[in-house]
Amino acid sequence: MADVEVRKEKKKKKIKEEPLDGDDIGTLQKQGNFQIKPSSKIAELDTSQWPLLLKNFDKLNIRSNHYTPLAHGSSPLNRDIKEYMKTGFINLDKPSNPSSHEVVAWIKKILKVEKTGHSGTLDPKVTGCLIVCIDRATRLVKSQQSAGKEYVAIFKLHGAVESVAKVRQGLEKLRGALFQRPPLISAVKRQLRVRTVYDSKLLDYDETRNMGVFWVSCEAGSYIRTMCVHLGLVLGVGGQMLELRRVRSGIQSERDGMVTMHDVLDAMWLYENHKDESMLRRVIKPLEGLLVNHKRIIMKDSSVNAVCYGAKITLPGVLRYEDGIEIDQEIVICTTKGEAICLAIALMTTATMASCDHGVVAKIKRVIMERDTYPRKWGLGPKASAKKALIAAGKLDKFGRPNENTPKEWLTGYVDYNAKKPAAQEVSPTNGSSEPSKRKLSTSSVEETAAAAVSEETPSKDKKKKKKKHKGDEEAPEAAEEEAEPVEKEKKKKKKKDKDRDRDEAQE
């Protein structure tokens, strides 16, 4: 009996509560309202478990904590399901045989969306990580296509090699910048190009069959098939690639919630027939998941829509900024709710931002957020409000320009910076006198202005005649050459006349 009890105790396993994985965003969305709240002092929060772009936000440098939170927009995980689909991506396990474009077209048809794009073409026989961007997320496709890739390849050598060490040594030689030419069967022009291989490892090698498996981390656009051929040449026996799988594209790997085509189909079927969003939210991830490795700048809610319309990203609109921002570095501008507004190129370093109180922080590279997601908050100052009142009263035209009803106070007190300044500006007086100094015209300049006035009054025919005279003067040296040409032209005309006569006679 005692033995039986011991066995039962061994069989009973304690069910451990597994901590929620940060990548499982389907379950994270219901845990809380992820949003930065305005405060007068630094709040003590544990933001290490916050998702996406708000992770560790309390470690960002604070420029200001004072702003007016707006109810518009929402956390990427709490978006409405239709909006969630339009601003998401799928980390897809591409099946063998169909091309990347076919797979993307199928997903577009399954999800019933307007646009889809992918992170870089995979050959039909190649499987693995293919990031499919949906609708608004297609704006990130270019940055994903240029991101680094990782592959696992199976190769076969055409002859025996002395040892596995030789194969490993050959792989190590194929690192750094390499010359590559696309394979015989390829969709692009077969011209020589340089691609960088960052790292490679020989995972396994079978000496009996001369087959091996290696892992490689390389630049986008590298040809692994060509690399296998080069490995065979380095070893002196020749070689070829048998199979290939992409295990990482950018920051998304095959371990980061990769899904199959069947998962996408099942998720959409559940949503359409049972209104169950849970699986669809697990299959599709918010586009902010692709920008986690970018340096962040958090903007005030009132300046979000202005940036969406292309306004400059200036310091007064910045709430927080990350350490280590360098000039010309690609960064992400985000809201207090963790939504990506745009990708930008930094024009200030972190140190400059800390020491300045004005200036342009970054220039926009690609706007991601839809316009008017947040309300317009520009044109609400005292001058702008007064201008709107005058337009409504008819004292300014609909474009805000002065008309006959415009009051004198407005004309003297308002400076329109959008109006184009005249080319000849008045020179500021250098003397102590209040009157602006006027430059006296010389007698020659007076005569020139008078002559110009007379020439303006004369009809345009005289101008044409003058132009013809000038042309005649220019063409004078070429006259000798032109005299020889008429003789040849006359001969040609005679020949044409003779041909015309022959045709007429033939018709008669």
Swiss-Prot record:
Keyword NADP: no
Comp. bias (Low complexity): 442-457
Pfam families per UniProt: DKCLD, PUA, TruB_C_2, TruB_N
Subcellular location, principal: nucleus
Phenotype upon gene inactivation: Embryonic to larval lethal. RNAi-mediated knockdown in female germline cells results in a cyst differentiation defect that prevents progression from the 8-cell cyst stage and oocyte differentiation.
Modified residues (Phosphothreonine): 443, 449, 458
Family matches, as InterPro entries: Dyskerin-like (IPR012960), PsdUridine_synth_cat_dom_sf (IPR020103), PsdUridine_synth_N (IPR002501), PUA (IPR002478), PUA-like_sf (IPR015947), PUA_sf (IPR036974), tRNA_PsdUridine_synth_B_fam (IPR004802), TruB_C (IPR032819)
Subcellular location per the Swiss-Prot or TrEMBL entry: Nucleus, Nucleolus
Domain of life: Eukaryota
GO cellular component: box H/ACA snoRNP complex; nucleolus
EC number(s) from the headed UniProt entry: 5.4.99.-
Any GO BP: mRNA pseudouridine synthesis
Region feature Disordered, mapped onto this chain: 1-29, 423-508
SMART domains: DKCLD (SM01136), PUA (SM00359)
Catalytic residues identified in the record: 123 (nucleophile)
Further facts: The name minifly was chosen to reflect the strong reduction in body size of heterozygous mutant flies.
Family recorded in the similarity comment: Belongs to the pseudouridine synthase TruB family.
Protein name as catalogued: H/ACA ribonucleoprotein complex subunit 4
Organism: Drosophila melanogaster (Fruit fly)
